[in-house]
């Protein structure tokens, strides 16, 4: 297992004495202690594909070409990679002093993009930039990353912690994640496979996920909402901050399992991760130019949280749908004769699924009615 690296960028202080990292407010010892403390969090995500490499500068993962299971799933395997962050949701985590969920978000944002192509997540790397190494905060973040990797079925192979007190204010941090997966080239899901008559299934989101938090935080400030207060409109006794920090749902395990249950026919033709841009802005990336996706807005109930935000921010409906997922976090386009079977398989593994529309001849548009 490669060690987690901690990079220290000092604050340049003017002094007549010899300068040191410690004198510049940067602790090498604290960074090394943190890196040493999280080995268990990394190892619990590792399977037999991970090759132990003590003291290495990079991680290694074996593609088990000679294993029968791998040969059954992959004849022409291709690597798939993507990267993403959590955006200003980290500011909300800072305000609430709750850091364990944004690590899950970090994994979700990348692996949910990865599986759009039908790729099996293999490994994940994280990058954490901080003002100062704070052991408990960083431990909570990486704990969330570890939990996210376990949910996605991929290995947390390593990471970087950059201490930069010149760039970040005290208490501030930022996150970036990088995911790599493998897909069978002939079974990659994309717009080219979509046909008129295909059915659009929507998988329920767990909340706001990780997009639109600049607007969310503006609403909280504008309406003078209290993050530590429970609001009856949200149908629960959890404080608002906790509701807003609900981690992004990771769809990897259920989606990949469902796709693989159809060993011969490719019944899932395209997919979309619903992030910034809303359902229309993301689904249109997964349909061809000669087709439209006709979406029935009445096919699912918009969760109370979105109406709560809309009310307190006086946000127009069109803006809400352009910014937020509105209760649908992932879409799958499937052949019509298999739509009911795919829905039942997804529900069996814990997803809430709505039949939200169909594909028709058109001009590459998503039409919401």
Describe each region flagged by the PLM:
Residues 27, 84, 197, 273, ...:
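Residue-level signature of catalytic and energy-coupling elements of molecular machines
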Residues 35, 139-142, 213:
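Hydrophobic face of alpha-helices
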Residues 83, 174, 187-241, 280:
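Short, acidic (Asp/Glu-rich) active-site segment that either coordinates a divalent metal cofactor
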């Amino acid at each position: 297992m490669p060690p987690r690296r901690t990079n220290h960028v000092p604050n340049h202080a003017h002094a007549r004495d010899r300068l040191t990292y410690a004198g510049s407010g940067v602790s090498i010892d604290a960074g090394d202690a943190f890196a040493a403390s999280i080995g268990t969090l990394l190892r619990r995500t590792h399977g037999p594909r991970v090759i132990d490499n003590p003291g290495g500068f990079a991680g290694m993962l074996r593609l088990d070409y000679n294993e029968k299971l791998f040969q059954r799933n992959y004849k022409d395997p291709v690597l798939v990679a993507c990267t993403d962050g959590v955006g200003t949701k980290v500011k909300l985590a800072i305000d609430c002093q709750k850091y364990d969920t944004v690590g899950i978000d970090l994994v979700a944002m990348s692996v949910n993009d990865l599986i759009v192509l039908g790729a099996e997540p293999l490994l994940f790397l994280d990058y954490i930039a901080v003002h100062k190494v704070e052991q408990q905060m960083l431990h909570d973040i990486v704990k969330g990353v570890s939990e996210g990797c376990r949910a996605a079925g991929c290995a947390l192979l390593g990471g970087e912690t950059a201490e930069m007190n010149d760039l970040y204010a005290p208490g501030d941090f930022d996150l970036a994640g990088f995911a790599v997966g493998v897909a069978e080239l002939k079974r990659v899901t994309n717009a080219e496979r979509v046909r008129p008559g295909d059915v659009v299934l929507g998988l329920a989101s767990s909340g706001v996920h990780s997009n639109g938090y600049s607007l969310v935080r503006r609403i909280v400030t504008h309406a003078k909402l209290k993050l530590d207060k429970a609001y009856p409109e949200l149908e629960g006794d959890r404080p608002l901050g906790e509701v807003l920090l609900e981690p992004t749902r990771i769809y990897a395990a259920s989606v990949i399992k469902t796709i693989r249950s159809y060993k011969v026919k490719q019944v899932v033709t395209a997919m979309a991760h619903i992030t910034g841009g809303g359902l229309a802005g993301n689904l249109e990336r997964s349909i061809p130019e000669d087709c439209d996706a006709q979406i029935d807005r009445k096919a699912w109930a918009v969760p109370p949280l979105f109406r709560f935000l809309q009310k307190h921010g006086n946000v127009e409906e069109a803006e809400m749908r352009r910014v937020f997922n509105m209760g649908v976090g992932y879409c799958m386009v499937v052949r019509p004769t298999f739509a009911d079977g795919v829905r039942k398989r997804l529900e069996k593994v814990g997803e809430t699924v709505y039949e939200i529309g169909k594909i028709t001849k058109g001009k590459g548009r998503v039409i919401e009615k």
